[in-house]
Amino acid sequence: MQLKHLRTLLSPQDGAAKVTCMAWSQNNAKFAVCTVDRVVLLYDEHGERRDKFSTKPADMKYGRKSYMVKGMAFSPDSTKIAIGQTDNIIYVYKIGEDWGDKKVICNKFIQTSAVTCLQWPAEYVIVFGLAEGKVRLANTKTNKSSTIYGTESYVVALTTNCSGKGILSGHADGTIVRYFFDDEGSGESQGKLVNHPCPPYALAWATNSIVAAGCDRRIVAYGKEGHVLQTFDYSRDPQEREFTTAAASPGGQSVVLGSYDRLRVFNWSPRRSIWEEAKPKEIANLYTVTALAWKRDGSRLCAGTLCGGVEQFDCCLRRSIYKNKFELTYVGPSQVIVKNLSSGTRVVLKSHYGYEVEEVKILGKERYLVAHTSDTLLLGDLNTNRLSEIAWQGSGGNEKYFFENENVCMIFNAGELTLVEYGSNDSLGSVRTEFMNPHLISVRINERCQRGMEDNKKLAYLVDIKTIAIVDLIGGYNIGTISHESRVDWLELNETGHKLLFRDRKLRLHLYDIESCSKTMILNFCSYVQWVPGSDVLVAQNRNSLCVWYNIEAPERVTMSSIRGDVVGLERGGGKTEVMVTEGVTTVAYTLDEGLIEFGTAIDDGNYTRATAFLETLEMTPETEAMWKTLSKLALEARQLHTAERCFSALGHVAKARFLHETNEIADQVSREYGGEGTDFYQVRARLAMLEKNYKLAEMIFLEQNAVEEAMDMYQELHRWEECIAVAEAKGHPALEKLRRDYYQWLMDTQQEERAGELQESQGDGLAAISLYLKAGLPAKAARLVLTREELLANTELVEHITTALIKGELYERAGDLFEKIRNPQRALECYCKGNAFMKAVELARLAFPVEVVRLEEAWGDHLVQQKQLDAAINHYIEARCSIKAIEAALGARQWKKAIYILDLQDRNTASKYYPRVAQHYASLQEYEIAEELYTKGDRTKDAIDMYTQAGRWEQAHKLAMKCMRPEDVSVLYITQAQEMEKQGKYREAERLYVTVEEPDLAITMFKKHKLYDDMIRLVGKHHPDLLSDTHLHLGKELEAEGRLQEAEYHYLEAQEWKATVNMYRSSGLWEEAYRVAKAHGGANAHKHVAYLWAKSLGGEAAVRLLNKLGLLEATIDHAADNCSFEFAFELSRLAFKHKAPEIHLKYAMYLEDEGKFEEAEAEFIRAGKPKEAVLMFVHNQDWEAAQRVAEAHDPDSVAEVLVGQARGALEEKDFQKAEGLLLRAQRPGLALNYYKEAGLWSDALRICKDYVPGQLEALQEEYEREATKKGGRGVEGLVEQARQWEQAGEYSRAVDCYLKVRDSGSSGLMEKCWMKAAELSIKFLPPQRSLEVVRVVGPQLIGIGKHSAAAELYLNLDLVKEAIDAFIEGEEWNKAKRVAKELDPRYEDYVDQHYKEFLKNQGKVDSLVGVDVVAALDLYVEQGQWDKCIETATKQNYKILHKYVALYATHLIREGGYAQALALYVQHGAPANPQNFNIYKRIFTDMVSSPGTNNAEAYHSWADLRDVLFNLCENLVKSSEANSAAHEEFEMMLLISHYYATRSAAQSIKQLETVAARLSVSLLRHTQLLPADKAFYEAGTAAKEVGWENMAFIFLNRFLDLTDAIEEGTLDALDHSDFQDTDIPFEVPLPAKQHVPEAQREEVRDWVLTVSMDQRLEQVLPRDERGVYEASLVAASTGVRALPCLITGYPILRNKIEFKRPGKAANKDNWNKFLMAIKTSHSPVCQDVLKFISQWCGGLPSTSFSFQ
């Protein structure tokens, strides 16, 4: 360590002004200096002077300079300073935590001599030395001081060890004494340790030794037991003077001694175990060092001098900067200061064992410290300043550190996991595991304290991939092991360590309860899971569902909600918990129920104060009330009475709250007076017992304390007089008689005649008691009393009076007893019979009326049957000789033997129908013989056979069956038995059974199933010889598949399928077997093909050798070529048969030609010496160029043939010129001539003949003339030519006739030209009549070939306007037609328009038709189903047209089930008051109210649309002739209903309006004539159930179930209306045609209703209001007065009415204000829309500051 001067804190003076003492505070923030003036100066850690205060003398009369301060020390909490003074006193000053706080003396300790030195090592403990030689202890808590030990020598120095647990004092005689408060297990001795040569004014206690020095200028280091380790002798150094003071570093690794102008520094070397002197710090004019103080973190040393100066030095071995963020200052070998450069915070890292710190790392997001020493590992949390040091043997730096848990560091090394809790110097534990993944390890360290559990530390980790172990880290033992069937990929304990969650590779989530060791799968697909921080609430994701378990103790109760993305995290703060979900690019927060989370957690932890604080932040709702009740119960159980009082106050239980308040006052007073727990006081315990209605316990508590009066007062206050009197009797209380009188008087005053009668009876006054009993309506008690007293029986009037009362009260048995007692048997018997007291009646009848006994026995039996006592009834029926009833009773009572006994006594007809019932019982007991006998007696032998069949007793069944069954039934029986035999492996027996019943196919199937093929073939051959071959083939395939080839061969060959056998062996590579089979069974060439395939598989010379061996080489070459395996054929020919190559080339060429590979084929043809074949190939494919190239190169004789072929192709393409040239090149003009003739091209034929074959010219001309004559001389060209000749000759009429005769279907242009020419000639040169005829002929012909314009032009030339227009129309040239009509004959304009409309209609060109005829266009749109275009077009027309088509479209949509789109139409276009539209509006309303999924907040806009349309309709009706009609009233009612639905949807979007929504659902029940009744009652019932109105919910849901049954039955006749008497809920409603609620929800309701009715905790009555009628009824049944319904809830307005401008419209003020408040707090747009509508509907809102903006 080196000292570096930093600054001068206090400048020295010119003379002696000694700094007497100095001290650093424990928290390193304050430094105190006491000057010679007895003033304490206070500095901050940076050396700035911040404060000062003066010390005071023990007694002011001696003056301020009467003492010196000799010792000073800070308290461990750094808020106090102890000052030791020479005037025999120690003062303790409280200086506070902040600068400038007032300095107050809080302790003072007066001593018998001067204080010479002082230390404050521990809380409340100040150690100081006195001039008289004593070392004493001052306790600041008790303000007393005591002597630790005493010597006879002045105490010159006092110091402590590093931990402050030991003290060392130096005395003037050189003695050094050691004392331990706690030796920390070191075993070091106490007492006098060493005798130093001089007074050890400089005394320091380092880690490994004690350093002492004094005026002899020697420094001596002593060992732990006082032996000298080292001596540093400076006595011969003239520069050195005496050593005045010494200080050890806080780490104990360095010592500094002060002398004159010099500070000497010694450092301990751990490796050499000796002190090494560093270079001394010499400062001129420093003078004598009088005081030294070392900062607690070891980074600063301050020295005070004789002249009053204070110098500050920096102490450092070395410094380094870590990642430019932290400064590491090594102030000693075992101590490092880590400073955060950005925040300035510092942490002191120190080895408590003095080991040298080797390296410091800052890991885990720069929060955690890790440092190694030779034998330990240092860990720390920079944020919380929690540091740990554990024993750690060097492992080569291979450790892996995980800092995911804020409380624990996880260290993984060589397969071992070690856990270290920050702030603890022992490892929590270590386990073996190979899985070091933070997701596979979970540690919980006191994360959530629970009541009664102080320490809770648990670890869960993977032992292997499928095994989880759970360890209690406190006890170090295993508390659970979970073996799972698949790999675990995530696990985590809850914060209390009671539950473990884990997920496996199949994404299944499991919950393990550590206490019960039970494992539950709670989710079958889990992509995200996390515990909610600070609770046991669990959040997980299952595909598109968010799952929340608010109560993990009930894992089956999960709250699920739909989400559209992936959960990415949880955020908890600000009083809410949110689940963050990414939906696309956005993150959406889903809020959890904070009440369930916070309250549940507080209750689980037993933190009732936290639970109370949370509940006080909530509004009082049914849920909150339930929480208060739970808390009140738990608080009482835990005796937290103030919490319980608060709970009952919140619940409005005033009496209980007041009672607890008084109890708390008693407990608090007792606690104040006597201390301890006030709840243990007897009055408190008794009052708590009273609160729990345990009055006996309260009495016991009072009597234990002899508080008899208090016990009696308690009972009297509770009006429990009997108990009060019993206490008085037990304790002999003097007021006993008075109590009894008061009790009787009280009973009479409170009309408790029964109790008064009992009191009189107990006191012996019978008449008075009877009188009181009768007065109380208790004649039975009176009768009992009379029967016990003979003297009272004698009083006939009294007895008559009593019997009359008994009969009136239907107490017939007691009346009978009385009549029998007074000897009136007739009346007694009547009473017994009426009271069903048959035993007494029969006994009386036997004595008095024997004839009646039989009748009474039967009646007795009937009564017992009604009471379900069938067993008892049997004997009575036998006595009454009622056999049938006796049998029925015996059967009902399951008295089978009695039943058989009775049956055996009856005739056969009577007994036969009962025997089977008894037989069934014995069959169920497997007593088959008895059952058979009974079935037989009852003529039910078939049932006996069925019994034996079901029991597997086939022999008995068969024996019976043969007696009574048909053959087909026996067959079924046998087959069943055979199947049973087959299951048992008895195949032969099964076969015999199958064959016996002529079912051999079943036997065949059985043998096949069990692979007994020989038996199978045997049966097929015997029973199905025609299928034998197919069976062999099928078996062969199966055996081949199983690899049983020899057996397969047998079956294939038996099936004559040798090819299948060959293929089987081939595919298995057994070629010899294949060849053998082919040769033996395959005919002449089969073995050759197999040989070819075998050889091909071998290839090369091996193939040649094989084929030579088989003698099939040449044949195989041919076979290969024939099978297109040319490569193999060439290979074989090359190796053995070269002369076969041309033949193979030719076959190959032909193959290539077939494949279309002509160039390759050409080469092969040439190689085969067949060029002619190549030429023919190309000619065939008309590749003339290639054909000519090959012919010229290899076969010149074929050139002419190629040219002729090419010419033929040209002729086929009508290219006569090219064909002519080719034929002439081939020197074949004759062929050209023939081709022209065949084509009818006589002119070309004549030309060719003339040029190349002139000798044939004459004959050709003759032939041509013959042809012309055959065709009538009128070929097209001939006609045209003839026409031209007539025209040139001036014969225009004949020319016209010729032109008109031209018909050439191939040339419309020629025909047009000719016909136009004819018309032109006729107009120019022929008479008008003739020209008109020609034009009338030409016009239609031109139109026929599509030349409409030309025809029209012709017609116009002759003024044929209509014909011209018709031509344009037919040519669809409408503009020209219109122009002609307009310009030449306007009469035809309408004619053109009409045709144009028809054209557009026929063509479907509606867009064009719109401009001509809108209505026709709209109708066409409707026909085509183009509704959108129809409505869009109609919108541009008048209102009437628009709504005609809107109605048509709406009707269409409704038929298609699209009521929502129909509604949207009327939202867009308005709802006119047309009567013909009324059914549409009603249908939309009906469909909307019947549709599912509309009872939620999301349906608001649909309901609002319906409401707005009906409002618009009603407004229009008011202005129409339909105003105030029945239809108008009906639509007004529909408007009100739709307003209720819309308001309900709006209210469902806000939590605080849930009761409003429920009330609206209830109000809608009065409109069930217009709504589906089952849906309305279901919605009302579920809404009532959700808000806790269980009575209403039960009645409505019960009604709903009745309605669903009525729908099933198709009638409402069975409905019970008693629950709805005196309400406005209608009885007569339309029966819904179908169920509107799904089956699953109906069953859920059925279960709930059944559960509630079984509990019998609800009263089946609708709630009533102040009118005494059902609270939601508008009509008061008693008065008939009808209240207005509230616009917000639909409930009747009885008071606090807010009226609107529109008559009949009002709201309840409370509901209205609640609705407004909800809008203001939530800013809900839908609720604002409701208000906006109410404003429109009701003519404005009441005066309010609410705004829609």
UniProtKB/Swiss-Prot annotation:
Annotated crosslink Glycyl lysine isopeptide (Lys-Gly) (interchain with G-Cter in SUMO1) location: 4
Subcellular location: Cell projection, Cilium
Keywords assigned: Acetylation, Cell projection, Cilium, Developmental protein, Isopeptide bond, Methylation, Repeat, TPR repeat, Ubl conjugation, WD repeat
Residues found modified as N-acetylmethionine: 1
Gene3D superfamilies recorded: 1.25.40.470, YVTN repeat-like/Quinoprotein amine dehydrogenase
GO cellular component, one term: ciliary basal body
Positions annotated as WD repeat: 14-53, 64-103, 110-148, 150-191, 195-233, 238-278, 284-323, 483-520, 521-559
Gene Ontology biological process terms, A to Z: bone development; brain development; cilium assembly; cytoplasmic microtubule organization; determination of left/right symmetry; dorsal/ventral pattern formation; embryonic camera-type eye morphogenesis; epidermis development
TPR repeats, residue ranges: 593-624, 692-725, 809-842, 854-887, 912-945, 947-970, 971-1004, 1042-1075, 1142-1175, 1276-1309, 1345-1378, 1411-1445, 1447-1477, 1574-1607
Expression (tissue specificity): Co-localizes with RABL2/RABL2A in the midpiece of elongated spermatids within the testis (at protein level). Expressed in the flagellum of elongated spermatids and sperm in the testis lumen (at protein level).
Entry keyword annotation includes Cell membrane: no
Modified residues (Omega-N-methylarginine): 672
Pfam families in the record: TPR_IF140-IFT172, TPR_IFT80_172, WD40
Similarity comment text for this entry: Belongs to the IFT172 family.
Biological role: Required for the maintenance and formation of cilia. Plays an indirect role in hedgehog (Hh) signaling, cilia being required for all activity of the hedgehog pathway.
Subunit structure: Interacts with IFT88. Interacts with IFT57. Interacts with RABL2/RABL2A; binds preferentially to GDP-bound RABL2.
The protein's name in its UniProt record: Intraflagellar transport protein 172 homolog
Gene source species: Mus musculus
High-level lineage: Eukaryota, Metazoa, Chordata, Craniata, Vertebrata
Gene: Ift172
